[in-house]
Regions:
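Extended alpha-helical targeting/anchoring segments
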Residues: 1-410
Length: 410
């Protein structure tokens, strides 16, 4: 129906009447103003109006619009994904698992005729071709294990020098494939059920995953961040998992890292909120291949605070960058040999009513031209161990690699 994208310093509006508008992003016209201008073009009424809004993503690279971070820019023929892309869909299917019901929604301008019957027939039509999924060749990475350990050692050195207290360094992997990547998404959500399950088909590329972490959620005038900081391997053996969880809970390094990132979340919310508090602290959450240490920070938006600005002021998550955040991101740009793209950004919903729900883009595949990109990282502090940090990346990728194997058998 309509979309807004931010790419190479330009805001692009595509409107329902087919028109296209472009405007440069400047200090006088920042990203939040562009998003608010676009949202202001639409007003929706009706019983299910709260579900209507923008669905899409903000890439990690979008930080260039919010802070002084020298993100490597590129214009590649094989990669036309914008830094931010949010779409207003005319039709939505809302699943209510509590009531076991499905609602088909349609947004209509005054005077427009409904096409709900046509859409419903298309949904019920099962006459489509199904394709298998098959991985081709071996998984590769721009970084070898040793090169990633060199980066980890450099991160530790920056912590020891006092440049940062923590820095999150990641490693990207690539896997060629043929067939239907939706089967891979089905496998992933089966292996690693998470609070955020998503599959976005943007035409030339797809982003899909099973993220455990809330980047920012706004309901009414209340904002929430759920920082995950602290990870250990899950074995499937209840006794061993209990020992691993206890080790994670008691480990001084993991606890120091967690406290630091909870404080960073509090600071991020405090830029636009008052009554900022910790709702729960160091809760163990179990996933298919890892155990996470999780807290929740919340606050009430100030009277003059705008939801979009509050969201942007939390970006990117401290758990995917480090602390102090700006210096950590500058070092990430120097140390990592590639743009992060979608990884470490966020994906989700921006409501027309001011609500917002964004997941951090982790445990996620980006699929384009028969290649899967996936990535994971870990928080590096002065007391980090390079072998442990290397293994943490492998642990976090466990569900994704297992999903590739399962998808081939579906």
């Amino acid at each position: 129906m309509a979309s807004v994208s931010i790419d190479h310093g330009t805001a692009i509006f595509r409107l329902p009447d087919g028109t296209r508008e472009e405007r440069p992003i400047t200090p006088e016209y920042p990203v939040e103003k562009a998003l608010e201008d676009f949202l202001g073009r639409f007003h929706v009424e009706g019983e299910y109006a709260n579900y209507c809004g923008l669905y899409g993503y903000t890439s990690f690279n979008a930080v260039r619009y919010f802070e002084n971070i020298p993100v490597k820019d590129s214009r590649e023929a094989t990669n036309d994904a914008p830094d931010m892309l949010y779409i207003l869909y005319q039709y939505l299917i809302v699943f209510n698992d509590f009531k076991n019901e499905m609602v088909l929604l349609e947004m209509l301008a005054p005077g427009e005729e409904s096409e709900l019957d046509t859409v419903q027939k298309a949904i019920n039509n099962r006459n489509y071709t199904a394709y298998d999924f098959r991985a081709v060749g071996e998984t590769t990475s721009p970084l070898t294990d040793e090169q990633h350990k060199v980066n980890i050692r450099q991160g530790i050195a920056h912590c020891l020098r006092g440049d940062v207290f923590q820095i999150v360094l990641s490693r990207r992997f690539e896997q060629r494939f043929v067939g239907d990547d939706f089967k891979l998404y089905r496998a992933l959500r089966s292996i690693n059920p998470s609070p955020y399950l998503f599959y976005f088909d943007f035409g030339g590329f797809r982003i899909f995953g099973s993220s455990p972490e809330t980047h920012c959620r706004i309901e009414g005038r209340h904002a929430y961040i759920d920082p995950i900081a602290g990870t250990t391997k899950r074995t499937g053996d209840p006794e061993q998992d209990a020992l691993n969880a206890q080790y994670l809970h008691d480990d001084p390094k993991e606890n120091a890292e967690h406290v630091m990132l909870v404080d960073l979340a509090r600071n991020d919310l405090s830029r636009n909120c008052h009554d900022v508090k910790v709702d729960f602290y160091k809760e163990m959450q179990y996933y298919s291949h890892v155990i996470h240490l999780v807290s929740r920070v919340s606050g009430t938006l100030n009277e003059d605070a705008r939801p979009i600005k509050a969201f942007i002021d939390t970006f990117p998550a401290g758990t995917l960058s480090g602390a102090p955040k700006v210096r950590a991101m500058q070092l990430i740009s120097e140390l990592e040999p590639h743009n992060r793209g979608a990884y470490g950004g966020c994906i989700g919903f921006i409501g027309l009513n001011g609500s917002l729900n964004q997941a951090i883009t982790i445990r996620t595949f980006v699929s384009r031209n028969g290649v899967l990109w996936f990535q994971a990282g870990g928080g590096i502090v002065a007391k980090s161990n390079e072998e442990y940090e290397l293994q943490e990346v492998n642990n976090k990728l466990g569900a994704l690699k297992k999903a590739i194997v399962m998808a081939e058998k579906m």
